[in-house]
UniProtKB/Swiss-Prot annotation:
Name of the coding gene: lldD
Enzyme class, UniProt record, top EC level: oxidoreductase
Main location (coarse class): membrane
Organism from which the protein derives: Yersinia pestis
Name by which UniProt lists this protein: L-lactate dehydrogenase
Protein's cellular compartments: Cell inner membrane
Lineage, top ranks: Bacteria, Pseudomonadati, Pseudomonadota, Gammaproteobacteria, Enterobacterales
Amino acid sequence: MIISASTDYRAAAQRKLPPFLFHYIDGGAYNEQTLRRNTADLADIALRQRVLKNMSELSLETQLFGETQAMPVVLGPVGLSGMYARRGEVQAARAADKKGIPFTLSTLSVCPIEEVAPAIARPMWFQLYVLKDRGFMRNALTRAQAAGVKTLVFTVDMPVPGARYRDAHSGMSGPNAAARRLLQAIAHPQWAWDVGLNGKPHDLGNISAYLGKPTTLEDYMGWIATNFDPSISWKDLEWVREFWQGPMIIKGILDPEDAKDAVKFGADGIVVSNHGGRQLDGVLSTARALPAIADAVKGDITILADSGIRTGLDVVRMIALGADSVLLGRAFVYALATAGEAGVINLLTLIEQEMRVAMTLTGAKRIADINRDSLAVSERG
C-alpha cells in the first residue's frame, strides 16, 4: 500500500493488525458519536487563506515547558503501544526523538520506564492515573524521576473505565476472548511473528515491575476494572504536586470551570481532551470545547489539546482555536503498527509538511502567528 498522506496509515494498520488490536485503538465509547465528532468537527473548521505575504522564511519551532521542540506536536500516552509493533513504545520514542518532539509513556505501556528512557536523548514525558493503589503511584513517580523524566501528564478523566462495546465484539474482552485473539493472531502471520513471538514480554512493564511478577492481557483488563478510583478529587493531586518538582499537566479537561480549577491548583498545563471519545460518549468534541477554555485561561496556563487530530491541517486548526501544542494518539499508533519507527517518522514528516503548506497559505510565519485570525470569519464566534 502506498502511503502518501498522514491519513493513509489507518487503512494500512487495519490490514496488518489482528482485529482485537485494531479495534481497541480505533474504537470509542458506547455508540462512538464523540469519536466521530472529534474528527468531523475539526475537519469542518475553515481556515483563512492569505496571499502575497512573503513566506520564504517559516519556522514550526516552539517552546514548551522550557524546552525547544521542532513543531508543536507531542506523541501522547497510548496504553499497550508495545502490542502494535515489536517493543513499540521504544520505537515510537525513538521516532519522536529523531523528529525533535517529546514522547509520552503511558502508565499502561508494554515497555517499562527503564527500557524506554535510556533509548532516547530527549527526556520523555510520563503519564499517570489517579489510582486506588497509591503505592503504585509513588513507585511509578520515583522510577520516572530516577529515569530523568521531568514532565508529568496526569490523566483525570478515567475515574471509571468507559464502556467500549467494540472491545467485546473484537475479542479484546468478552466471552472466549483469549481463544478469539489466538485465532486472529494466526490469521495475521506477519504480526504474529514480529510482535506476537519476537516482541515479548507482552506484559504491562510498569505494573509488573511494581508487582514483581508478569502481567497478562487478562490482568490488564482486570487491573483497569478494579484500580481506577471514582472518589478522586483535586485533593488527591495535592500530594503529587508536592512530590513532583517538574512540570505537571492535567489531561482530560473539557470544561472552562475545570480549566480554571487547574490554574488555581497550580498545574503547569492542561490537555483539553475527551480521551479520544473513549470515555463519555455524547460530550463535546475537543474542537468545539477548546475555544471557550482558551478564552477562560489562555495566558495563565499552557494549553494542549488532543482527540481527532490526524493531519498537519488539524494541528494548525487546534492552535488557531487556542492550543499551544497538540498530542497525537491514534494517528501515531496506526503508523507504528504499519511500519514501526520508520512509519512514525514518516507520519511526523507528513504532518510537518502539511503544517508548512497551511501556514504558508494562511500567512503565519511562526507558530505564535497562528490564532483566531487564522480562521475564516465565520469560524471566529
